[in-house]
Swiss-Prot record:
Subunit (UniProt): The glycine cleavage system is composed of four proteins: P, T, L and H. In this organism, the P 'protein' is a heterodimer of two subunits.
Recorded GO MF terms: glycine dehydrogenase (decarboxylating) activity
Keyword Kinase part of the UniProt annotation: no
Family to which the UniProt record says this protein belongs: Belongs to the GcvP family. N-terminal subunit subfamily.
Gene3D superfamilies: Aspartate Aminotransferase, domain 1 (3.90.1150.10), Type I PLP-dependent aspartate aminotransferase-like (Major domain) (3.40.640.10)
NCBIfam families: PRK00451.1
Keywords: Oxidoreductase
Annotated protein name in UniProt: Probable glycine dehydrogenase (decarboxylating) subunit 1
Function in brief: The glycine cleavage system catalyzes the degradation of glycine. The P protein binds the alpha-amino group of glycine through its pyridoxal phosphate cofactor; CO(2) is released and the remaining methylamine moiety is then transferred to the lipoamide cofactor of the H protein.
Pfam families recorded: GDC-P
InterPro entries: GcvPA, GDC-P_N, PyrdxlP-dep_Trfase, PyrdxlP-dep_Trfase_major, PyrdxlP-dep_Trfase_small
Domain of life of the organism encoding this protein: Archaea
């Protein structure tokens, strides 16, 4: 008699099945149903078959925060090096001189691009950077009202609300004018003694390049100016530091980081020197070691894991160090002339896109100049029909801002990759659909 039979006999049962008789069959473990084992080459064949179902080669006219841009292969090579790829937040920072230097270089590059005094080591993404900026403004002046443009996307507003609700801060929207730009009179009427900060976007949520942001420093009174910018656009547009921004933030995905579904992004935050000790996250600085050699250190690390919770400025945990390396590498490879070229190509292709759609009767909502995202008047929801033709595009504004008065507004996006051939394919598809 084998061991199992002996145990069954001792227990007075006939099979192991009786041990689980009180467990319903519907919740018991079953065969997974993946079939028998395959040889290596057959596994690869199966994987390729599944991969072929992906829609990776579709023409892309999507944007509104995440963009399809050219990424130099050198960027991918650098961030794939195991010394960086496997690194976590350096808790003994001086040991990780390479990682610290890469963050220091990133901070320097962004500060130069934004024309701001300091840049922190990173935030999670652009939206969380906005939330942290609002909290930073509260720490600076103790006031409880934030003014944001009506072109702010609902998802961004939701994150902002989540960040400031514990401070009992009030979020109030100001109007945009018929050009899709800041309504200066309306904004000015809302700024009072309780206003902690005015948030501006350039380009804004309508995709419009808004020169009215240059006037805000004249009317903001004692409140702070928080500027949410597109880093690629700064290749040609005036940087936030040159129009009086106290805090400048951005989503850094465009700087050498691929598009992804639920993966990591990069929150950029820069600020004036006066506010450095109110800033969240970490700040890497340059010093010298005991031998007088150049060394890098965590100059500030005011998060709750490092200092007393009551004194911490943020509970941000892991920084986005690998993505700051990608952004720093991207900016270093392109240089100022390369970034300017990418920005100019983006504007050129956006203009070509608008003219081409205009030729078939699809007009822009605003006559103003757009950067990447352009809002068109299209009553029909064309997104699914375009997808069937291998084209991604046609985001409805009301899917981004539910109560927007521009119900017919539909976005199409251009980058440096959007050449005339791709635009022609979109035009041909829309002519059939419309």
């Amino acid at each position: 008699m084998d061991e199992i039979s002996s145990m069954l006999d001792y227990l007075g049962i006939k099979s192991t099945e009786e041990l689980f008789s009180d467990i319903p069959l519907s919740v018991r473990k079953k065969e997974i149903g993946i079939g028998s084992p395959l040889d290596e080459h057959l596994v690869l064949e199966r994987a390729r078959k599944y991969a072929s179902l992906n829609s990776t080669e579709m023409l892309n006219f999507l944007g509104n925060g995440i963009y399809d841009r050219v990424i130099p292969e050198a960027v991918n090579y650098i961030i794939s090096k195991s010394e960086f790829l496997d690194s976590y937040t350096p808790y003994q920072p001086e040991v990780s001189q390479g990682m610290l230097q890469s963050i220091f270089e990133y901070q320097s590059l962004i500060s130069d691009l934004f024309k701001m005094d300091f840049t922190n080591a990173s935030m999670y993404d652009g939206y969380s950077a906005l939330g942290e900026a609002a909290r930073m403004a509260y720490r600076i002046n103790g006031k409880n009202k934030i003014l944001i443009p009506e072109s702010t996307y609902d998802s961004k507003l939701s994150v902002l609300k989540n960040y400031v609700w514990g401070l009992s801060m009030k979020i109030e929207k100001y109007k945009m004018n018929e050009e899709g730009k800041i309504d200066i009179d309306d904004l000015q009427s809302r700024i009072d003694g309780d206003t902690s900060a005015v948030v501006v976007e350039n380009p804004n949520g309508y995709g419009v390049i808004d020169e009215n942001v240059f006037r805000i420093s004249e009317i903001k009174k004692e409140s702070l100016l928080i500027s949410y910018v597109d880093p690629i656009s700064l290749g040609v547009l005036k940087p936030p530091g040159e129009y009086g921004s106290d805090i400048a933030i951005a989503e850094g995905q465009q700087l050498g980081i691929p598009m992804n579904f639920g993966g990591p992004l990069l929150g950029i935050m820069s600020f004036k020197a006066d506010y450095v000790r109110k800033s969240p996250g970490r700040l890497i600085g340059e010093s010298v070691d005991a031998d007088g050699k150049r060394a890098f250190v965590m100059t500030l690390q005011t998060r709750e894991q490092h200092i007393r919770r009551a004194k911490a400025t943020s509970n941000i945990c892991s920084n986005q160090a690998l993505l700051t390396l990608a952004a720093g590498s991207y900016l270093s490879i392109l240089g100022s002339s390369g970034l300017k070229k990418v920005a100019l190509l983006t504007i050129k292709h956006s203009k070509n896109l608008a003219e081409s759609l205009g030729n078939i009767g699809i007009e822009k909502v605003f006559d103003s100049i757009s950067f990447s995202d352009t809002l068109f008047r299209i009553d029909k929801n064309v997104m699914l029909d375009l997808a069937k033709k291998g084209i991604l595009g046609g985001i409805k504004l009301t899917s981004l801002i539910k109560d927007s008065k521009y119900s017919s507004g539909t976005f199409f996006t251009a980058t440096e990759k959007t050449d005339n051939e791709k635009i022609k394919a979109l035009v041909n598809a829309l002519e059939v659909i419309m």
